[in-house]
Design a protein with these regions (language model features):
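A short, Lys/Arg-enriched amphipathic alpha-helix followed by its capping loop at the start of a domain
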Residues: 5-8, 30-37
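Active-site acidic/histidine proton-transfer and metal-coordination neighborhood
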Residues: 26, 31, 71-75, 86-173
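Aromatic- and glycine-enriched glycan-recognition loops and surfaces
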Residues: 21-26, 53-67, 115-120
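Boundary/entry segment of secreted carbohydrate-active catalytic domains
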Residues: 2-24
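Structural motif
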Residues: 35, 43, 130-131
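Glycine-rich, proline-tolerant flexible connector loops at the mouths of alpha/beta enzymes
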Residues: 41-67, 85, 140-148
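Conserved beta-strand positions in the central sheet of alpha/beta enzyme cores
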Residues: 41, 78-80, 137
Length: 173
C-alpha cells in the first residue's frame, strides 16, 4: 500500500522565534536537518519563515523556498493553517480569546476576522499547489468547543470576573 507520509518531520511553529536559528527559513531548516528530521511543516502565519501571499502568487518564490529546504537537507511536508482555520468558525463566546490569532486590524470584528481567515485558507490552497503539495493541515474551527473543551485557555481572571458580574446582577434581586 502506497503512503504519502514523509518524515520523520517536525512542525516548526513551536520553535519559530526572533533568535537564530529559529528566525529565518534558511537557518531553521538547517537546524531541523541537524536533528535528523527529513521533513518540515511550515506555519503559514509566521512571516519570518514564509510569505503566504507571495507563495500563493508566485511559483518562483515557492521554488526558491523548496530549494532552500532541499539544500539544507529537508523537504516541505505540508503547509499549516491551524490558526487561520480555527478562525473560520469561532463560537461567539470565544470571540475575544480568538482575536489573538488574527491581525489587529480585525480584532473585535468577528465577520471581518472570519473573512480574513477564509482568504488565508484560499491563499494556502494556492500556495500548496505552487509548492507541489497534495495535503495541508489545519483546524476547522470551534463552534461547539465551549461545550466540550476549554480552549483556547481562559484568560487570567475570567472566572473571577464572571462571578463578580453575577454578584452585581443577582444581589439586587
Amino acid at each position: 500500500m502506497a503512503t504519502n507520509i514523509k518524515g520523520p518531520a517536525i512542525f516548526l511553529a513551536q520553535f519559530a522565534g526572533d533568535a537564530a536559528p529559529f528566525n529565518s527559513w534558511d537557518s531553521i531548516t538547517k537546524w531541523a536537518a541537524s536533528l535528523g528530521y527529513k521533513g518540515v511543516q511550515i506555519p503559514t502565519w509566521d512571516g519570518r519563515l514564509f510569505d503566504l501571499k507571495k507563495a500563493a502568487e508566485s511559483k518562483t518564490y515557492c521554488d526558491e523556498v523548496k530549494g532552500v529546504a532541499k539544500k539544507n537537507g529537508v523537504e516541505i511536508t505540508e503547509l499549516s493553517t491551524h490558526l487561520q482555520g480555527q478562525l473560520v468558525a469561532v463560537n461567539p463566546a470565544y470571540d475575544e480569546a480568538f482575536d489573538a490569532f488574527a491581525p489587529a486590524a480585525v480584532h473585535g470584528k468577528p465577520k471581518e476576522r472570519q473573512k480574513w481567515a477564509v482568504e488565508q485558507m484560499m491563499l494556502a490552497a494556492k500556495a500548496s499547489k505552487n509548492l507541489g503539495l497534495t495535503a495541508t493541515v489545519s483546524f476547522t474551527g470551534a463552534l461547539a468547543w465551549p461545550y466540550t473543551y476549554p480552549w483556547p485557555q481562559r484568560p487570567q481572571g475570567l472566572i473571577e470576573t464572571a462571578f463578580s458580574e453575577l454578584a452585581k446582577r443577582w444581589k439586587p434581586i
